[in-house]
A protein has these predicted regions:
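Short runs within selected transmembrane alpha-helices of multi-pass transporters and secretion channels
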Residues: 65, 134-152, 160-168, 189-202, ...
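Short alpha-helical transmembrane segments in multi-pass integral membrane proteins
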Residues: 1-14, 72-137, 181-237, 293-358, ...
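Small-residue-rich hydrophobic transmembrane alpha-helices
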Residues: 44-104, 141-160, 267-331, 362-385
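Helix-loop interface residues and adjacent transmembrane-helix termini in multi-pass membrane transporters
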Residues: 29, 38-41, 75-78, 153-154, ...
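Hydrophobic/aromatic residues in alpha-helical transmembrane segments
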Residues: 15, 31, 68-69, 109-110, ...
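Hydrophobic transmembrane alpha-helices of multi-pass small-molecule transporters
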Residues: 56-59, 171-175, 201-205, 277-280, ...
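Transmembrane helix-bundle signature of multi-pass secondary active exporters and lipid flippases
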Residues: 17-70, 134-141, 203, 230-295, ...
Length: 437
């Protein structure tokens, strides 16, 4: 990515990432569609409320993946093959340890977290079951995502897309077999996700082991190289903390939503699944910007980094505008895919129409943040995200719930936080020393 036409390099790298994330969102959404239609709206609410906890616990692992990706992309851009080799094997060691820890912690804390969230009794048991089965397979998810991060860091986003497509198709068939055919209910949905993640994990590790490129994986060489571990942690921890704290703020929002009952929870769950089809492509463009910036920082090409930031920001904002318009127009039809319960559909549409007009701000915020992380300035990006997407939301919810119990007021914590984050990020780009090499 250090040579060639910038917009083509970013776009052609981002497209497989976008398709991959859409496929990943697809098999998460299929869980909800099948559960909502074949198990019931309470089960849909259980799956939806589980999402906040899943995001909370995997956030730190995503941070580690970001740190590894920045380190690998900078080594790759500088043509430091030994650095790439050591960073890849350190990344895999982190993935294995993090995956095991996530499994144990996730299964253990699930009941307590759901109680803290005020999950209604009629969906509590199903939420516990779904989450604990899901976390049973979290090792596969962590290993796959960090392995895909290695491929993305060296510019090979197409290969991970193929394996994710296989996993998505497998998940759909497994959902139909386990939920519809075997009548395993919410357990079947979680098992289908676990097995599909295992399939993608096997495929991507097989490719890395067979590869003859600089990122070839050798099982016997998996270990933590101290100097690289500290560098990955130094870059990754701010992103991990950012993800965890933002997930905590979303957990607080989910807790507020739970207080309105299972029907509202189901409507919110349906919206969140659809929202993924906007945010995940934006995050894919952000990841492309991170890799582009990392490789060109390694190659000592700051002007190319700056131009790449402008181009990728236009891409992210443009995509968000298009999806926002489409979802505003087709909101009832889209939410109606998840359930036949008309009240749930009404709440889902109500929530969706609060957010869609403001998606473009989220696009700008995330893509600028991705570029800044690629230069290694993850601490600065973390501060912007924490102030806006966490601090502001928590204060808004605290004030809103003390003043009035209105679903609309709760939902309105999101757009102003996106505006604040976008403005702070633009200010940092304009005045900050983010391009210092």
């Amino acid at each position: 990515m250090t040579e060639g036409v910038i917009w083509k390099e970013i776009l052609f790298f981002a497209i497989p990432l976008i398709l991959g994330n859409l496929f990943q969102q697809l098999y998460n959404t299929v869980d909800s569609i099948i559960v909502g239609n074949y198990v019931g709206s309470n089960a849909l609410a259980a799956v939806g409320s589980s999402g906040a906890i899943i995001n909370l616990l995997i956030g730190f692992c995503i941070g580690a993946s970001t740190g590894a990706g920045v380190v690998i992309s900078q080594f790759y851009g500088a043509k430091n093959t030994e650095g790439v080799r050591k960073a890849v094997h350190t990344t895999m060691a982190i993935a294995l340890v993090a995956g095991v820890l996530l499994t144990v912690i996730g299964i253990t804390v699930t009941p307590s977290m759901l109680r803290l969230m005020g999950t209604p009794d009629k969906v509590f048991e199903q939420s516990v079951i779904y989450l604990q089965v899901y976390f049973g397979g979290s090792l596969f998810s962590v290993v796959y995502n960090m392995s895909a991060g290695v491929l993305n860091a060296v510019g090979n986003s197409r290969r991970s897309l193929v394996y994710l497509m296989i996993a998505a198709i497998s998940n759909i068939f497994l959902d139909l077999i386990m939920v519809v055919g075997l009548k395993l209910g919410i357990v079947g949905a979680a098992l289908a996700t676990d097995i599909s993640q295992l399939i993608s994990c096997i495929f991507i590790w097989g490719f890395l082991i067979r590869s003859e490129d600089v990122y070839k994986l050798k099982i016997k060489e998996i270990r933590c190289y101290d100097h690289l571990l500290s560098k990955i942690i130094r870059i990754g921890i701010p992103t991990g903390i950012q993800n965890i704290v933002i997930s905590l703020s979303n957990l607080i929002v989910q807790t507020s939503v739970n207080s309105f009952g299972a029907t509202v929870m189901a409507g919110f769950a349906a919206y969140i699944k659809i929202d993924g089809f906007n945010i995940l492509p934006v995050l894919s463009i952000s990841m492309a910007a991170t890799t582009f910036a990392g490789q060109n920082i390694g190659a000592r090409k700051p002007d190319r980094v700056r131009k790449g930031m402008y181009i990728s920001t236009v891409m992210g904002a443009g995509y968000s505008v298009l999806t926002g318009i489409m979802l505003l127009i087709f909101a009832p039809q889209v939410i109606g895919v998840f359930t036949t319960n008309q009240k749930v559909v009404e709440y889902g549409v109500y929530i969706m129409r609060y957010f869609c007009p403001f998606y473009w701000m989220l696009g700008i915020l995330h893509v600028l943040g991705g570029t800044i992380r690629g230069t290694g300035k993850t601490m600065q990006a973390m501060v912007v995200f924490l102030v806006s997407l966490c601090g502001f939301r928590v204060m808004w919810i605290a004030g809103t719930m003390a003043w009035t119990r209105s679903l609309g007021h709760v939902m309105m914590c999101y757009p102003p936080s996106w505006l604040l984050g976008m403005l702070l990020m633009l200010l940092y780009v304009w005045k900050g020393k983010w391009m210092d090499l």
